[in-house]
């Protein structure tokens, strides 16, 4: 693939993973200049954006690049102005343009601090009511790996600080023991490496790499749902590490019991230690995050502008910091001082037309389950008793009506059921709605509640 084709694919995947605001503000107009010696040089016309992408999104883009090109590539975002210096350096010291060898890639799986964002430490983590317990648990684990809580399972929505805490744990462990072997990875990357090890007949090297360590930090574990072989491999990796008193830290967007198509033996192991959840920051925490950010960056922003951002952006920390960066870029490009009016103008696309919360199948299962007294896990179970089967059909019907997910995807979230089962459920509930006005009112009430989640 050409650089253009590679980056088009990266942007396509990134658009699905990032919020619309983050994608359009920071990543949309970037361009891949070259890939050389395991590094992807990516151009951004705005200095603020280049710095922000290196700090906050390099890890996500690195994982996507791995999926697209099939080997480890570290993204480095530079401005178009910096490109001249880069080109001069390349001319002075020409480098070989070969793909990294397998040996180099494998050796780089344990990279110490290079795995972690230098900014993501416990010192830079702003504590508030929504994250105080996860922070305390993470610090306890970092102080005494495998002695406090093992595993530590952190869950919460996107951009709330789960990855920050995992990086902070990694930094702290290495502060106390520079020789510790620490791996930070995502379950998606773990899966891709596992598949590659099978393809290249390198299973033993893969197992050695992940089992001969002191701390495993694995992000977004929900990605392994429905991946039977990956779950089995991770099960044995988990057992090996746990039995040898090695620390395991796991993050997810939902608690273990709500991860569909996760083997019971893995689910139970995830629940062995401590499960903590991170919730969106309150106003005071949002203000503290913004104030800390401007102190770190030595920025001069009036308090009323920060107050406006903190009041308007309530979803997560990533969106909050993204709004601040957007404001700085807007002010710089227009050459105008930052005021409340300019802040409102810079963020008008976010504020005036907020993207409504996307309804998930998990939202539907939760509301329907509460109404009919059905546990979340029962929606994925094989049970066919009417007290469970009928609410399951209602949830399938609502999933088709209220989401854009495909029939196979809906079936997957209900225990891996075939798409024809979803069609049958939709047809049956549609028929019952026409025949029973009381039932119709019941389902309409459920729909309203789901839309208000």
Curated annotation (Swiss-Prot):
Residues 1-71 are annotated as: Domain I, interacts with DnaA modulators. ATP binds at residues 159, 161-163. Residues 71-114 are annotated as: Domain II. Pfam families: Bac_DnaA, Bac_DnaA_C, DnaA_N. One of its GO terms (biological process) is DNA replication initiation. The keyword Endoplasmic reticulum does not apply. Changing residue 318 to H: Binds ADP and ATP, greatly decreased ATPase activity, induces excessive chromosome replication in vivo, inhibits growth, dominant negative to wild-type. It is found in: Cytoplasm. It catalyses: ATP + H2O = ADP + phosphate + H(+). Its EC number is 3.6.4.-. GO terms for cellular component: cytoplasm; plasma membrane. The keyword DNA-binding applies. CDD domains: AAA, Bac_DnaA_C. SUPFAM superfamilies: P-loop containing nucleoside triphosphate hydrolases (SSF52540), TrpR-like (SSF48295). Keywords: ATP-binding, Cytoplasm, DNA replication, DNA-binding, Hydrolase, Lipid-binding, Nucleotide-binding. Residues 115-331 are annotated as: Domain III, AAA+ region. GO terms for molecular function: ATP binding; ATP hydrolysis activity; DNA replication origin binding; lipid binding. Residues 332-453 are annotated as: Domain IV, binds dsDNA. It is an enzyme of class 3 (hydrolase). InterPro entries: AAA+_ATPase, Chromosome_initiator_DnaA, Chromosome_initiator_DnaA-like, Chromosome_initiator_DnaA_CS, DnaA_C, DnaA_dom, DnaA_N_dom, DnaA_N_sf. Oligomerizes as a right-handed, spiral filament on DNA at oriC. Domain I is involved in oligomerization and binding regulators, domain II is flexibile and of varying length in different bacteria, domain III forms the AAA+ region, while domain IV binds dsDNA. Plays an essential role in the initiation and regulation of chromosomal replication. ATP-DnaA binds to the origin of replication (oriC) to initiate formation of the DNA replication initiation complex once per cell cycle. Binds the DnaA box (a 9 base pair repeat at the origin) and separates the double-stranded (ds)DNA. Forms a right-handed helical filament on oriC DNA; dsDNA binds to the exterior of the filament while single-stranded (ss)DNA is stabiized in the filament's interior. The DnaA box is 5'-TATNCACA-3' in this bacterium. Strand separation requires the DnaA boxes and adjacent DnaA-trio motifs as well as ATP. The half-life of ADP-DnaA is 1.5 minutes at 37 degrees Celsius (in E.coli the half-life is about 41 minutes); it exchanges very rapidly for ATP, DNA with or without an oriC region does not stabilize ATP-binding. Melts the oriC region in vitro (open complex formation); melting requires ATP (not ADP) but not its hydrolysis. Belongs to the DnaA family. This is Chromosomal replication initiator protein DnaA.
């Amino acid at each position: 693939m050409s650089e253009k084709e590679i980056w088009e694919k990266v942007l396509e995947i990134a658009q699905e993973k990032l919020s619309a605001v983050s994608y359009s503000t920071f990543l949309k107009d970037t361009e891949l200049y070259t890939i050389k010696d395991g590094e992807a040089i990516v151009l951004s016309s705005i200095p603020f954006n280049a710095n922000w992408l290196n700090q906050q999104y390099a890890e996500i883009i690195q994982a996507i690049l791995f999926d697209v090109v099939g080997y480890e590539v570290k993204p480095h975002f530079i401005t178009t102005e910096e490109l001249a210096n880069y080109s001069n350096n390349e001319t002075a010291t020409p480098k070989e343009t070969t793909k990294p060898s397998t040996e180099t890639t494998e050796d780089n799986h344990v990279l110490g601090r290079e795995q972690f964002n230098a900014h993501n430490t416990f010192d830079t983590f702003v504590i508030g009511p929504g994250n105080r317990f996860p922070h305390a648990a993470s610090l306890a684990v970092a102080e005494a790996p495998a002695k406090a809580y093992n595993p530590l399972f952190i869950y919460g929505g996107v951009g709330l600080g789960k990855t920050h805490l995992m990086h902070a744990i990694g930094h702290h462990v290495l502060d106390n023991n520079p020789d510790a072997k620490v791996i930070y990875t995502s379950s998606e990357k773990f899966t891709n490496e596992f598949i590659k090890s099978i393809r290249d007949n390198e299973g033993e090297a893969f197992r050695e790499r992940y089992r001969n360590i002191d701390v495993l930090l694995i992000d977004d574990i929900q990605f392994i749902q429905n991946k039977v072989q990956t779950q089995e491999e991770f099960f044995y990796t988990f057992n090996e590490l746990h039995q040898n008193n090695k620390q395991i830290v796991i993050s997810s967007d939902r608690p273990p019991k709500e991860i569909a198509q996760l083997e019971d033996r893995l689910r139970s192991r995830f629940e062995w230690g401590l499960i903590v959840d991170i919730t969106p920051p309150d106003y005071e925490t949002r203000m503290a995050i913004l104030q800390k950010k401007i102190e770190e960056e030595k920025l001069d922003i009036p308090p009323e502008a920060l107050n406006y951002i903190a009041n308007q952006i309530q979803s997560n920390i990533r969106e909050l910091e993204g709004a601040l960066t957007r404001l700085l870029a807007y002010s710089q490009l227009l050459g105008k001082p930052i005021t409340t009016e300019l802040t409102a103008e810079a963020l008008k696309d976010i504020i005036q037309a907020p993207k409504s919360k996307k309804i998930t199948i998990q939202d539907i299962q939760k509301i329907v389950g509460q109404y009919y007294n059905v546990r979340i896990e029962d929606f994925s179970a094989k049970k066919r008793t009417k007290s469970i089967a009928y609410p399951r059909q209602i949830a399938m019907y609502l999933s088709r009506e209220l989401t854009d997910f495909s029939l196979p995807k809906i079936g997957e979230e209900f225990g891996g059921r075939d798409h024809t089962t979803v069609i049958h459920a939709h047809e049956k509930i549609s028929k019952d709605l026409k025949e029973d006005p009381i039932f119709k009112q019941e389902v309409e009430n459920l729909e309203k509640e789901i839309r208000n989640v």
